[in-house]
UniProtKB/Swiss-Prot annotation:
Name of the protein in question: NADH-quinone oxidoreductase subunit C
Family note: Belongs to the complex I 30 kDa subunit family.
Membrane topology: Peripheral membrane protein
Catalyzed reactions: a quinone + NADH + 5 H(+)(in) = a quinol + NAD(+) + 4 H(+)(out)
Predominant location category: membrane
Classification via SUPFAM superfamilies: Nqo5-like
Keyword Translocase set for record: yes
């Protein structure tokens, strides 16, 4: 008898064939990688196909791969990762979709498929600058409306660009250039071969 993961993997391969870039298993969960062009069709089928039936999106986040693998990574910079749950079949799936353009990361919105994606997509837009095409209300959700940049991008300065303070003379909050001096961050040095149980 096949395990749940084997059954899910077989169902995914039967439903999508070569339209998935990859299917991998790690820590008891499957991850599929989907091209942005196929994303909406794959997402709709993941929800509607009775053999898959992922009726719930439980998380969506953005990722910036700019410094991934200490510079050895040569793929697209931005991705969105969805975590799906099938209550009916009692299994989970991670879906990764890469934005094809690093300058303007654009990924189709899945709000029409899973409405729980609404604020998650706004968060990924706010923090990473990933534009979710077709989102009904794509605007900042965590940072201030006048905020410049996207703070979770790897190239965003740690101290930011501006700081906010209360000005007693103007009796209001004002923005000013950052007054914090840049610091050089010392890299972590691991001197033991098996530091923290990791194999090198």
């Amino acid at each position: 008898m096949a395990s749940k993961l084997e059954t899910l993997k077989a169902n995914l391969e039967a439903a999508f064939g070569g339209r998935l870039t990859s299917i991998t298993e790690s820590i008891g969960e499957l991850t599929i990688v989907v091209k942005a062009d196929d994303f909406l069709e794959v997402a709709t089928r993941l929800r509607d196909d009775a053999k898959l039936h992922f009726e719930q999106l439980i998380d969506l986040c953005g990722i910036d791969y700019q410094t991934y693998g200490e510079g050895a990574y040569d793929g697209p910079r931005f991705a969105a990762v969805l975590h799906l749950l099938s209550i009916t079949n009692n299994w989970r799936l991670r879906v990764r979709v890469f934005a094809p353009d690093d300058d303007v990361p654009l990924i189709p919105s899945v709000v029409e498929i899973w409405n729980s994606a609404n604020w998650y997509e706004r968060e990924a837009f706010d923090l990473y600058g990933i534009v979710f095409e077709g989102h009904p209300d794509l605007r900042r959700i965590l940072t201030d409306y006048g905020f410049i940049g996207h703070p979770f991008r790897k190239d965003f300065p740690v101290s930011g660009y501006v700081e906010m303070r209360y000005d007693p003379e103007e009796k209001r909050v004002v923005y000013q250039p950052v007054t914090i001096e840049p610091r050089e961050i010392t890299p972590r040095v691991i001197r033991e071969d098996r530091y923290g149980g990791l194999k090198h």
